[in-house]
Amino acid sequence: MKKLRYIIIAFLSLGLFSCSDYLEHNFNDQMTIEEVFSKRPTTERFLAGLYGYIPEEINAYDQSFVPCADDAYFSWEKMDYELVNSGSYNQSTTGVRGEWTPKFNPWSKYYVAINQATTFIAHIDECKELTGEEREVMKAEARFLRAYYYFNLFKQYGPIYLWYDQIADLAIKSEVIDRNTVDECVGFIEKEMYDAAQILPKTIQDPTTWMGRMTKGAALGMRSRVLLFAARPLFNGGGSIGYGRGMVNHEGKPIFPQGEDLNKWTKAAEAAKMVIDLDVYKLHFNKTETDPVLKAMNSYREVFTEKWNEELIIARYY
């Protein structure tokens, strides 16, 4: 018994020493932000990291409620999916709130992504190994991604706080941060997407280096969705129940529109027409099969099995 006690003490001591060594990091071998943006490879890797925050929309745990709404998942064995299907998903059943969401947690994830995108935009011009055109395109990618992540927050939480081009202040107190209004959020998001679209390429010329990266159609297509989202009654006067009309910020300013603006529907339609007028996207048809029945079958199958086709505007590989 005494021997066993000594063995246990010895192992615990080794564990303590290991933890001590593990926690003693040497930060001298880590790159500064200036060093990151001094080289092409590290600058490109920083941009690639921004793409890493794009949600997996097939995964309900990555802020996608689509799998919860049908039989994509067997909801009986997935408690949170069943809550959505039964209409019982709310704060009291899941503990959902802004800074801590056990299952659907985009809050901290997207604000980290937003801050990293702003950092990229602020420093990309320091990389002289990239041409001026390359820097402008990469900056447009980051600008679109930042707006897209703001939109994902807006979809779940409504009006949120906008940092604009300011890098996040870690010392700022939460009580001094106030929500922007719905119109301010939508106006910023859609303008950022529109501005990015003016620079991004219309089509993917080199699939080996550009596949999966954002294009003009991606930016305009997502902008169209943003404006359509903002035109719906929930964010456009609150419908017959006046949803959100009583919500104000700390200054007493209403954060939801107080009445319906029909022009928002017109703006959403015009945004969708801009995507159509690109003349890039169309229904996919199999190009090799001659039998009409097999051609129809293969055309439908290839929409899901081919890595890229004419119907895809934004895609993420799995």
Residue ranges and their predicted role:
Residues 19-68:
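Membrane-proximal, proline-rich intrinsically disordered regions
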Residues 229-231, 258-318:
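Polar, glycine-rich mid-to-C-terminal structural blocks
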Residues 237-258:
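A solvent-exposed, charged loop/short amphipathic helix patch at secondary-structure junctions
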